[in-house]
Design a protein with these regions (language model features):
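Metal-dependent peptidase/peptidase-like ectodomains
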Residues: 1-94
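His/Asp/Glu-rich mid-to-C-terminal helical/loop segments that flank catalytic regions of hydrolases
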Residues: 92-148
């Protein structure tokens, strides 16, 4: 479980939402400037898919108390940021996540190649640029540690 290592993780990214394309990310204000730098090249890699960086305007979310719901939950309940990419279907393939997800139809051939290719590039650029920051992302404004 290595709790001493969790404080060294900038963010846990979990891609488990169907074969749609990554179109943006929404981050707390304290992370915005870092993500602006990290995401700078993303709008120029494919004119078919824009990338939008947004500041989260909602209050910090409660720190989860249990490790249920998804793969990221254990990290979140231990205070690790678990910000995910925003995804969409701008070309209208009409992928129905709830019809396919975790069923016998949840197979590789349901993937949308142009979405997966673009998302792979976006993910690689963001991971590389985050990994090359000289500091971890701020956790300020992410979790409300006072909610019991």
């Amino acid at each position: 479980t290595n709790p001493e290592k969790l404080v060294k993780i900038s963010n846990y990214f979990n891609r488990d939402g169907g074969p749609t394309v990554t179109k943006g990310i929404t981050v707390p204000e304290a992370m915005y400037d870092d993500f602006k730098k990290v995401c700078e090249p993303l709008d120029s890699i494919n004119p078919d898919f824009s990338f939008e960086l947004n500041k989260r305007t909602s209050k910090p979310r409660p720190l989860p108390k249990t490790a249920g719901g998804s793969d990221h939950a254990y990290f979140a309940m231990n205070g690790v940021p678990t910000i995910s990419f925003d995804n969409g279907d701008p070309k209208g393939y009409d992928f129905n996540y709830m019809e396919i997800w975790h069923t016998e139809r949840d197979t590789y051939n349901m993937s949308i190649p142009e979405y997966m290719n673009h998302t792979s590039v976006v993910t690689a650029i963001v991971m590389y640029n985050l990994g090359n920051l000289d500091h971890l992302l701020s956790r300020e404004g992410l979790y409300d540690l006072n909610v019991k």
